[in-house]
Swiss-Prot record:
Basic and acidic residues bias locations: 111-136
Main localization (coarse): other
Glycosylation sites: 261, 517
Gene, per the UniProt record: CG-3
Cleaved propeptide residues: 23-62
Protein's name in the database: Beta-conglycinin alpha subunit 1
Record-level Gene Ontology MF annotations: nutrient reservoir activity
Quaternary structure, from the entry: The alpha-, alpha'-, and beta-subunits associate in various combinations to form trimeric proteins.
Role summary: Seed storage protein. Accumulates during seed development and is hydrolyzed after germination to provide a carbon and nitrogen source for the developing seedling.
Keyword Transmembrane helix part of the UniProt annotation: no
GO cellular component: aleurone grain; endoplasmic reticulum; protein storage vacuole
Length: 605
């Protein structure tokens, strides 16, 4: 009988258990409406990864509620999953699901399957097209939408959108490139390819402030291996405004200073005395290595510009300037000595030395020190008058002094006519230049004048444009490859052309024929390296023409034309040195006839 009742008893127990579970679930759902709502919102997520993450957050919500009930620990309210945001309560920190990381109990899945990828593309592309259609032609909003889409959806942009965007970017880049190239493109091309041209951008600024600047030119041999013999020479440019002073300093290099514009009081300090000179445009003076000097611009209106040829004595092509003064741009070289050395040298406490020479007392802050901003400072008129009392003017009568300044225009020009004047001082005439094996030249040319083709026998000439503009043409030989067929290859000439303006520098190697055409009133200054016994050979003109000195028998063999034709051609030019740059009209009989000078001269045309 018990066996007959056992199944009925078991069935009753199962029924009671199911009813209890049903009531328990209903009660739990009633007590946890947020969890239920969270689960319902998860059903709307089609992406499997986001669906799993949503369920994980709902489970965390349940755990947080249970822990809160057990320990009575307040927890932040979970963010609703629907798009609308609830109003932010005071003191409640806003959380962003995309920005704030949440604990995810599942590892981030690997790249999606192809089916999911295709399904996602079908969903997202129409959305982007719809946004683009709503924005119309507003480019800024269009770019913002595209960037937002790319951040939200890590899928490739549709092919047609990629092509359109790439095409727009290419067009913009092409327009920008064309506008940049159109601006002085031809001039930049010549400057970059011409190894003998040094534009203003080839200078490096050493010191600069509102009163002036000091710049040094790039090393010559860094520009071209053809200028290897100039590796020991550097060019400095100094500019200063009126009523200014370059603080005392010395360098480990011999200086040859030339005044290009303005007036300067240049003082050289010796062990027992000092020499001060009032220098004008065209004056030059050698400053031996290690000599302390300073420069004043005493003029009230005109700026001072000078060029310095520096010949280092310690390292080839490298030199240093040592300033006595301590400034924000340069420490005094005295500060390099130890404290006890300074105290013993001046028999004074270091604190006093520091205060007097370096403008800093021990314990002073950086902002409290009284330092000059740079090595070029302003000077009062009273101080200028005091410094000018002992200044001597350069002599225009003598150029043979061993230590006094000389003027490049002190003698008559070596070449002169109505179109230009050429002044020059050679090492044979000046001991200062003889020690350095240098000649100095200064040239004035009228607009439209042409300095006839010529070459220097051994001097390398550094030409500095001071005022005006010019076109210059230099002729060299193309480099030939060292091969067995070299004997069969003809030697070809190469023309280096440049448009020069103020502050440009051009180097003329020895033996390279050169011609200068002034496109405006022109003034330039030249330094000749290896100047002793240099000879300037002209290739045209009635005087000093090297071609006219060649015997007729050799001319017959050297040129296609006869010796009589060569002589006649050379005599056509009655002027010398400076001529009109506009060629004269030829007679009808000479038209079409090949000229006899077809070698080097042909490279100038």
């Amino acid at each position: 009988m018990m066996r007959a009742r056992f199944p009925l008893l078991l069935l009753g127990l199962v029924f009671l258990a199911s009813v209890s579970v049903s009531f328990g679930i209903a009660y739990w759902e009633k007590e946890n409406p947020k969890h239920n709502k969270c689960l319902q919102s998860c059903n709307s997520e089609r992406d499997s990864y986001r669906n799993q993450a949503c369920h994980a957050r709902c489970n965390l919500l349940k755990v947080e509620k249970e822990e809160c009930e057990e320990g009575e620990i307040p927890r932040p309210r979970p963010r609703p999953q629907h798009p609308e945001r609830e109003p932010q309560q005071p003191g409640e920190k806003e959380e962003d699901e995309d920005e704030q990381p949440r604990p995810i109990p599942f590892p981030r899945p690997q790249p999606r399957q192809e089916e999911e990828h295709e399904q996602r593309e079908e969903q997202e592309w129409p959305r982007k097209e719809e946004k683009r259609g709503e924005k119309g032609s507003e480019e800024e909003d269009e770019d913002e939408d595209e960037e937002q889409d790319e951040r939200q959806f890590p899928f490739p942009r549709p092919p047609h959108q990629k092509e359109e965007r790439k095409q727009e970017e290419d067009e913009d880049e092409e327009q920008q490139r064309e506008s940049e190239e159109s601006e002085d493109s031809e001039l930049r091309r010549h400057k970059n390819k011409n190894p003998f041209l040094f534009g203003s951008n080839r200078f490096e600024t050493l010191f600069k402030n509102q009163y002036g600047r000091i710049r040094v030119l790039q090393r010559f041999n860094q520009r071209s291996p053809q200028l290897q013999n100039l590796r020991d020479y550097r060019i400095l440019e100094f500019n200063s405004k009126p009523n200014t002073l370059l603080l005392p300093n010395h360098a480990d290099a011999d200086y040859l200073i030339v005044i290009l514009n303005g007036t300067a009081i240049l003082s050289l300090v010796n062990n027992d005395d000092r020499d001060s000179y009032r220098l004008q445009s065209g004056d030059a003076l050698r400053v031996p290595s290690g000599t302390t000097y300073y420069v004043v611009n005493p003029d009230n209106n005109e700026n001072l510009r000078l060029i310095t040829l520096a010949i280092p004595v310690n390292k080839p092509g490298r030199f240093e300037s040592f300033f006595l003064s301590s400034t924000e741009a340069q420490q005094s070289y005295l500060q390099g000595f130890s404290r006890n050395i300074l105290e013993a040298s001046y028999d004074t406490k270091f604190e006093e030395i520091n205060k007097v020479l370096f403008s800093r007392e021990e314990g002073q802050q950086q902002g409290e020190q009284r330092l000059q901003e740079s090595v070029i400072v302003e000077i009062s008129k009273e101080q200028i008058r005091a410094l000018s009392k002992r200044a001597k003017s350069s002599s225009r009568k003598t150029i043979s002094s061993e230590d006094k300044p000389f003027n490049l225009r002190s003698r008559d020009p070596i070449y002169s006519n109505k179109l230009g004047k050429f002044f020059e001082i050679t090492p044979e005439k000046n001991p200062q230049l003889r020690d350095l094996d240098i000649f100095l030249s200064i040239v004035d040319m009228n607009e439209g004048a042409l300095l006839l083709p010529h070459f220097n026998s051994k001097a390398i000439v550094i030409l500095v444009i001071n005022e005006g503009d010019a076109n210059i043409e230099l002729v060299g030989l193309k480099e030939q490859q060292q091969e067995q067929q070299q004997e069969e290859q003809p030697l070809e000439v190469r023309k280096y052309r440049a448009e020069l303006s103020e502050q440009d520098i051009f180097v003329i190697p020895a033996g390279y024929p050169v011609v200068v055409n002034a496109t405006s009133n022109l003034n330039f200054f030249a330094i000749g390296i290896n100047a002793e016994n240099n000879q300037r050979n002209f290739l045209a003109g009635s005087q000093d023409n090297v071609i006219s000195q060649i015997p007729s028998q050799v001319q017959e063999l050297a040129f296609p034309g006869s010796a009589q034709a060569v002589e006649k051609l050379l005599k056509n030019q009655r002027e010398s040195y400076f001529v009109d740059a506009q060629p004269k009209k030829k007679e009808e009989g000479n038209k079409g006839r090949k000229g006899p000078l077809s070698s080097i001269l042909r490279a100038f045309y």
